Amino acid sequence: METNLSEEKQKPSKSQAQQRRQMENYEFSQLANELPLARAISGQHIDKTTMVRLATAYIKLHNIFGQSQRAYSSADYYYGSDSLWTNNHLDLLDGFFVILDRRGDVLYISETISIYLGLSQVEMTGNAMVDYIHEQDINCFNSALNYCDLNWPQMCNVRVKSSLTKRANKDAVRASPGYKVLRLEITMGPNTNTRMIACYPMPTPVLSTVTIPSNSFVIITSIDLHITFADEKAHQLLNNPFYPDSNIKGMSLYSLIDISDSEVISKMHFDIFNLGAYKTPYYRMILNQTSETFYVESNIFRHTSISSKQFNDSITFVSSIL
């Protein structure tokens, strides 16, 4: 008799628990439909924790850009809508785009992250950006994040986790397996609590596959930055024309840099051994060993090759003239 009464009491409680689960699943199903994800992604199974994380990030993003839209409305009336980021901007990026909140959590990251790093938009949204940055580069990243301004963007080169680095070229320096070097250009978002980051992957360090534009030149140095090779354009720009027999080969690269910008090269010289690749801001080089200078921006690679007879270690500069 007591057993039957106990079973009768359990039936309603089981029914109520089942009903709660059904209602919960329905609400999460509705939430999944509201998330602004690609169909291919939303069609996959996303666990409830991930759904809440994504929803929280998108609500924050909506609040930030909803306010900025209202703030910009009067300016747009006079200046047009070019003051706002549009999807067309993302199409022009040879990389991917990230928006962070004041704590450094990812509010938005473009889907092209999968092309360059093999990571997913769903995986990174709502998580801290520093969780994906090499521990030795976190201070550099945080410094750029804190000191950027709307009219004074910051740039840094950092190693970011990647699942696409397992098949590296045998001659490429792999100081940090599982990471890829990116150049980050960081600026303030619509308000002081957000940061917008354009992320560009460094070109391949295999020189034969690097396209050299007409306004660029190539210099190769030893690891102490003494020049071992310079192409014809580099000779035209850097040799002393009054001494036809002069040659920049064997000279220290530092002697060809404007002294005011030597810190740029000094920082690169230190970082290249950790990163293996580096993108500089604009700096000045001395034109034909005179008092005149010109601005360049350099993609720099450390390149090693090992054979049975020797070990070669060099640094290659592919510099574009402003």
Curated annotation (Swiss-Prot):
Major localization class: nucleus
Localization: Nucleus
Stretches for region Disordered: 1-23
Molecular function, one GO term: DNA binding
Tissue specificity statement from the Swiss-Prot or TrEMBL entry: Expressed in a small subset of neurons, probably AVJL and AVJR. Expressed in the AVH neurons.
Gene Ontology biological-process entries: nematode pharyngeal pumping; neuron fate specification; positive regulation of gene expression; regulation of DNA-templated transcription; serotonin receptor signaling pathway
Listed Basic and acidic residues bias regions: 1-11
Keywords from the UniProt entry: Developmental protein, Differentiation, DNA-binding, Neurogenesis, Nucleus, Repeat, Transcription, Transcription regulation
Entry GO CC: nucleus
Residue intervals of the PAS domain: 82-152, 203-276
Domain (bHLH) ranges: 8-62
Protein purpose: Transcription factor. Involved in specifying AVH neuron identity, acting in concert with unc-42. Involved in serotonin-mediated feeding behavior, probably acting by modulating expression of genes involved in glutamate signaling.
Subunit structure: Efficient DNA binding requires dimerization with another bHLH protein.
The protein's name in its UniProt record: Helix-loop-helix 34
Species name: Caenorhabditis elegans
Gene: hlh-34
